[in-house]
Amino acid sequence: GSEMCIRDRLRPDPSSTPIVTDTNFAESYYQNLGRTWERMAFIKARPVSGNILKGKEFLSNISSFIWRNHFDYAAIDDVKNLREKMKLNSTHLKSFNLSGYNIKIGIGGIRDIELFTQTYQLVVAGRQQELRGANTILILKKLKEFGWLDNRSFETLVDAYILLRTTENRLQIINNT
């Protein structure tokens, strides 16, 4: 059977709070103490079970945390530091080697394309609401339409993303994961 991995550290102030907190606490935490990686996680967040309306209300209430009204160039350094930390903690990111290459987190993999896309979103989607969304390919298309990406970069990123996601899905089928 399949198992669901729950990462209990991915919550507001994990070292000092219970696994479940009320939404008022969570909203206050994110508005006052939330970090860039948490903003990135919420870019793709959506309610999938329980009270869907409450989930949508929560996301609406923290939208000013996710989407800053100013061009958030500090997010670029935060993402760069995040990527460096990821690199230190993964043998897949220390060098490019096709033998044992990890298409999800390896250099130039799925995560790199998503980090690239989400970094643009963090920087400019507070003002350009059309750049808000969870679909990486649609956001890349909008980045091209708004002049943030040239045609060649757009095509390269989209082609690579589709190839990597297709490969990932096929590997998951083969490995039953």
Report each predicted region and the residues it spans.
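A nucleotide- and high-energy phosphate-metabolite-utilizing enzyme signature
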Residues: 2, 7-177
